[in-house]
Amino acid sequence: NGLSSVMVAHLNVPSLESRTNYPSSLSKPIITDLLKSKLNFQGLIFTDALDMKGVSNFSVPGEIDLQAFMAGNDVLLMSENVEIGMEKIMLSYYSGHISEDRLAHSVKKILMAKYKVGLNNYKPVETKNLVADLSRSKDDILYSKLMQNAITVVKNNNATLPIKDLELKNIAYVEMGDSSGDTFLKTLKKYTKITPVSDNNLDGLIRKLKQFNLVIIGFHKSNSTPWKPYKFTNKELVWLHEIARTNEVVLNVFSKPYTLDAIKSFSNFESVVVGYQNSRVAQELTAQILFGALPATGKLPVSISNSMYKVGHGFETSKIDRLSYGNPESVGMSRLKLSKLDSVANFAIEDEMTPGIQLLVARKGKVIYNKNFGHHTYSKQRKVSFEDLYDVASLTKILVTLPLLMELVENGSVNLDDRLGDLLPKYKTTNKSDITLKEMLSHFARLKPWIPFYKSTLDSVTNTPISKFFSSKKSKKYPIQISQNSFLRKDFTDTIHQNIVDSELLEEKKYRYSDLPYYFLKDFLESYY
């Protein structure tokens, strides 16, 4: 029971070790007297890497290994010379400086640890589905939650964050640092128009930024290892201060919070955000926090900028009414099942049901699937893009008719193989009787793509509306609004239905988009509910 192991760092702790600058990893008072005796820690004790300068400067290779073992460590990591280290320890054992009990103590602890993890009955790791086993969705969700709760708003003048009134904002993005900020920019663009701006000359950059009323700066540094440089260059500091002096700036640092130590004054920055890492997740979440799709709750883990911002500091911002982005499993859905949508979309394009598709799935305020397929037209000159804008139409079919049908199918009230003649007996004697619900919804019902109903309301000579069909005022006889100050007579819906009933079916059974089934489905749903 209890903690299985600890690692002792190469720290200088004068209150526990009297020798000047002596590393804790070689200190018997710290490891044996305090950790093992006073605190009664019985787990494995690891050294930090013995090739690090924090310890290697205190002795020669091999001798360091001996000192580490004598101090009370069980496992010595990254010895500079394993062979010499073993020789030193063995000589000390044979000379009596290391007792049998001391050696056996560590050996038994190591053997017990191996037994605990099953190495006494070793079985190779099963590599089948290894990537899926290691890339668990619950781990992704946990990492996202940790990052979201860590990201810290250090400064937020005039409640700049979250960014509101987007119609009044003209926003530029300036990238700094030596690592990529592509994910950050891509996520920012999901909320509004963002213009990336760059120039090799500071004066040129300042001129370009004059047309914008908000500048988002992303400082991106590699975090592939902890030893990568994380600071601003002198040039970047000059540019940063000049941009902030002439523009409203939101600075985002995707690096250690200590990066901000180099900034002498924050007076010209509207907001400052620390993202801690330059990972994909950190960039995505930071962008969402800027626009209020997610709240900011993070606090600084260290004091920075000469304690101007202390440990525990951090402004909290509210979530506003905007969609966030995340994993399907975070809202109770499956990414594996959603991946099947790719096949459906690709099939529709390959079969020329449509030249292109943009598909988005959102649940509980979170977008969990968003992909583009194909092109704008069959000529394939322009690919579908996330930045495309669409005319929104035909919403009644998907917002009213389809959900009601889905509910009826789900509870077993209707079946996708039910025929129109059975759903609506009045169509039993028509050529539409045997059309199934599945065929109607998938546009394989052999119905005409459309029927120009409006033509029967126009004068055949003048091509103008016939007065008996329309009125400028709404009434019981004319209740259907067509346009401003134009209302259609109520009984014209009977004409529409009769035209559909009388229409011929297409000879070939293949995909043909048609609105006509939804006239039937409207009748059915109104009769059912």
Region spans (language model):
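Preference for extracellular/luminal or secreted protein segments
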Residues: 28, 37-38, 58-330, 334
